């Protein structure tokens, strides 16, 4: 085979993950080739250099000791999850030892379940399996192992992963629950990336979906092998009693993003999908132990608070006894992600007194499961022998599958596992109360922003809600939870309905709004009768379709934003250009203003010059008039001078008359020419001879008119000459010659 096989049986390679042997572990003769570095070698390995999760065979013979092994069969010097039957590794992570008291505990281990009567606590909180009634020591990091005794009370761990009871497999740090079989850290007896073979107890994988069979284990990333068939990654999971959840919440044969199957004995994942719920959604049904960050396990004993606000509960289930005075209180922290309290009453018995569960909430919490203001997680259900707690952000649908038979009813309860399938939901909780034995009636509710859809606990409830707040299915057992809402929380109150035991086979469902009170009783206000179904955009769609729609919408909005940004950029450019134009215009206007001011100054200067010239002319005129008056007196005294003056004035008069006559003659000639031209144009049918005759006639008439005017002028001249006598000359002499 290749040098790096995954899940190959009986292969020889330098590096392999989870190579399971094809032969039976009981046969001591079947051996594999030496591996320098191996993970989860199920058969008898011979001198492995480095091994993870090598399960030991039943025969203690023919097994050498690796120098560094994880879950090796014999005593490794450093081991992770080695279930050793012979000796104990000096350093082990999750080494679950056998039940025989001959084995010892490792000095350093993660979740090493050793069967010692009084085990010492390990460094990272590997609580050992207690075969007797002794209580194991508390672990600092809280990686829990299952307790074999039903009466033993394991102490709480440092980081809040509780130790569960014997019926419920404990959760590992990453969601793998090492129950009865030897479970290594990175894989069980099946291979790491391939389909695992069936084992006695189902262990959840790291990221993958666990198998749906009751005796199957899940690989790290791969789909598990199941007795009924493997479930795809995006399908509805089948319910399987006993499957454990993976790290991101895929439980049983439920896929990563599917409606989770309700299992009776499943352990939750690290991020709070309780039970067999996937990462985004529904919580499992009865018997689910909490995860690392979110949920708290049900128990009757008090729990010590964890440093990060993850409330832990050490569950101690007492069989065939009524848990009357059990009242667990979760310690409140300053900043908590989830604290859920759920009282686990007696399995298959009717509680004689109602158990009181009280959860104290923190000042700032994400999803306290007990009646908070706005809950993103599941509500606490006071169910007998089954309690589920909500995760941090997983909006889980809690369905209690154990139908408790009331005191007045003698009919046995039908403990059919109810498979609750839900998408991620943000809505009002739905409480389903089952008081009588009922057959597995499958109800299928589809709500968008779904309010409560009440369903019986024994029926398989498929809730495809877009953002619906979880369903809590409470049994008919009378419980009085004391709930305290936090000051600030993201959770709607999950209704804890207190119902009386019913004798008839009827399903009583109601959704009540619980008012938090300081007393031990919960006050049920008026029940919400018909909760309307709110629309949702992501109802019935896969994650890929939702992401594609979001991507297309993001691209469209990005395109619109780019268009608007380009338009704004164009406007900005135009504004900048106009700003430049305005600046240039302002500069030019400033220049024009300066030019206008200089022009005004020049005009003022010219005006002053004109005023000076006017003053000079006035002085000159005054001087000329003065000279004329002085000389006139001398001219009047001389006769010859006076005669010359009169002749000069007469010549000026004649000249003016001649100018007037020339003007008149010019106007007459123009009018005559205009009239003759009009007559010639008016006559169109004239011959050239007629035209010549007409022209000659006009010339003749003109000459005759000139002759007449000349005679008139000559007569007038003669008259003027006759008038120029001596007396007239004297009268004409005093005229102003300068006028």
From Swiss-Prot:
Location of this chain's protein in the cell: Nucleus envelope; Nucleus, Nuclear pore complex
Region (26 X 2 AA repeats of F-G), start-end ranges: 6-450
Disordered, as annotated region: 18-67, 79-245, 281-329, 341-366, 399-418, 471-533
Keyword Zinc tagged: no
A single MF term (Gene Ontology): structural constituent of nuclear pore
Sequence repeat segments: 6-7, 17-18, 50-51, 52-53, 68-69, 70-71, 78-79, 80-81, 91-92, 93-94, 108-109, 110-111, 124-125, 141-142, 159-160, 174-175, 186-187, 207-208, 221-222, 248-249, 271-272, 280-281, 308-309, 366-367, 426-427, 449-450
Key words, A-Z: Coiled coil, mRNA transport, Nuclear pore complex, Nucleus, Protein transport, Repeat, Translocation, Transport
Single GO biological process annotation from the record: mRNA transport
Biased composition (Low complexity): 79-218, 232-245, 472-519
Coiled-coil residue spans: 584-674
Record comment regarding domains: Contains FG repeats.
PANTHER family: NUCLEAR PORE GLYCOPROTEIN P62, NUCLEAR PORE GLYCOPROTEIN P62-RELATED
Record note on quaternary structure: Part of the nuclear pore complex (NPC). The NPC has an eight-fold symmetrical structure comprising a central transport channel and two rings, the cytoplasmic and nuclear rings, to which eight filaments are attached. The cytoplasmic filaments have loose ends, while the nuclear filaments are joined in a distal ring, forming a nuclear basket. NPCs are highly dynamic in configuration and composition, and can be devided in 3 subcomplexes, the NUP62 subcomplex, the NUP107-160 subcomplex and the NUP93 subcomplex, containing approximately 30 different nucleoporin proteins.
Family of this protein: Belongs to the nucleoporin NSP1/NUP62 family.
Protein name: Nuclear pore complex protein NUP62
Biological source species: Arabidopsis thaliana (Mouse-ear cress)
Gene: NUP62
């Amino acid at each position: 085979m290749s040098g790096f096989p995954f899940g190959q049986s009986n292969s020889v390679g330098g590096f392999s993950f989870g190579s399971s042997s094809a032969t039976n572990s009981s046969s001591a003769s079947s051996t594999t080739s030496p591996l320098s570095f191996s993970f989860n070698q199920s058969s008898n390995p011979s001198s492995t250099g480095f091994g993870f999760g090598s399960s030991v065979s039943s025969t203690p013979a023919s097994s050498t000791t690796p120098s560094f092994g994880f879950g090796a069969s014999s005593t490794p010097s450093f081991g992770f999850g080695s279930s050793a039957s012979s000796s104990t590794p000096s350093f082990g992570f999750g080494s679950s030892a056998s039940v025989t008291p001959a084995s010892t505990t490792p000095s350093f281990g993660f979740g090493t379940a050793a069967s010692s009567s009084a085990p010492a606590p390990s460094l990272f909180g590997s609580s050992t399996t207690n075969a007797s009634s002794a209580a194991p020591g508390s672990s600092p990091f809280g990686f829990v192992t299952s307790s074999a005794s039903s009466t033993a009370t394991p102490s709480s761990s440092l980081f809040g992963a509780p130790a569960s009871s014997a019926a419920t497999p404990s959760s590992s740090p990453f969601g793998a629950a090492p129950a009865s079989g030897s479970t290594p850290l990175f894989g069980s007896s099946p291979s790491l990336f391939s389909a695992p073979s069936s084992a006695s107890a189902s262990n959840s994988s790291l990221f993958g979906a666990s198998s749906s069979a009751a005796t199957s284990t899940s690989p790290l990333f791969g789909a598990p092998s199941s007795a009924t068939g493997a479930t795809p990654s995006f399908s509805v999971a089948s319910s399987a009693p006993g499957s454990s959840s993976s790290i991101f919440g895929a439980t049983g044969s439920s896929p990563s993003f599917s409606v989770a199957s309700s299992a009776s004995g499943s352990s939750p994942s690290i991020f709070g999908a309780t039970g067999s719920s996937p990462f985004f959604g529904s919580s499992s049904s009865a018997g689910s132990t909490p995860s690392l960050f979110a949920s708290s396990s049900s128990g009757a004993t008090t729990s010590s608070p964890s440093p990060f606000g993850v409330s832990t509960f050490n569950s101690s289930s007492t069989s065939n006894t009524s848990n009357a005075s059990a009242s667990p209180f979760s310690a409140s922290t300053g900043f908590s992600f989830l604290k859920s309290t759920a009282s686990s009453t007696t399995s298959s018995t009717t509680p004689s007194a109602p158990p009181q569960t009280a959860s104290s909430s923190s000042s700032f919490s994400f999803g306290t499961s007990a009646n908070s203001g706005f809950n993103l997680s599941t509500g606490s259900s006071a169910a007998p022998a089954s309690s589920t707690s909500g995760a941090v952000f997983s909006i889980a649908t809690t369905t209690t599958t154990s139908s408790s038979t009331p005191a007045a009813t003698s009919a046995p309860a039908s403990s059919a596992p109810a498979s609750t399938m839900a998408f991620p939901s943000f809505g009002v909780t739905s409480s389903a109360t089952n008081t009588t034995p009922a057959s597995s009636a499958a109800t299928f509710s589809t709500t968008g922003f779904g309010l409560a859809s009440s369903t019986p606990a024994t029926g398989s409830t498929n809730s495809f809600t877009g953002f619906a707040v979880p369903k809590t299915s409470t049994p008919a057992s009378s419980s009085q939870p004391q709930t305290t809402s936090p000051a600030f929380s993201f959770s709607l109150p999950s209704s804890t309905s207190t119902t009386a035991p019913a004798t008839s086979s009827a399903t009583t469902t109601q959704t009540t709004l619980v008012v938090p009170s300081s007393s031990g009783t919960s006050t049920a206000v008026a029940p919400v009768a018909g909760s309307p179904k709110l629309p949702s955009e992501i109802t019935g769609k896969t994650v890929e379709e939702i992401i594609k729609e979001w991507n297309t919408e993001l691209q469209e909005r990005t395109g619109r934003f780019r268009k608007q940004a380009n338009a704004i950029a164009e406007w900005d450019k135009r504004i900048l250009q106009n700003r430049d134009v305005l600046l240039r215009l302002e500069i030019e206007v400033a220049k024009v203003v300066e030019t206008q001011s200089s022009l005004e100054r020049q005009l003022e200067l010219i005006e002053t010059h004109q005023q000076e010239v006017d003053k000079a002319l006035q002085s000159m005129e005054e001087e000329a008039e003065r000279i004329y008056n002085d000389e006139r007196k001398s001219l009047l005294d001389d006769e010859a001078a006076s005669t010359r003056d009169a002749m000069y004035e007469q010549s000026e008069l004649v000249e003016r008359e001649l100018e007037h006559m020339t003007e008149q003659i010019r106007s007459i000639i123009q009018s005559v020419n205009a009239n003759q031209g009009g007559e010639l144009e008016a006559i169109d049918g004239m011959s050239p001879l007629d035209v010549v005759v007409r022209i000659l006639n006009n010339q003749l008439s003109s000459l005759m008119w000139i002759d007449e005017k000349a005679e008139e002028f000559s007569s007038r001249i003669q008259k003027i000459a006759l008038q120029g006598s001596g007396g007239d000359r004297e009268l004409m002499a005093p005229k102003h010659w300068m006028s």
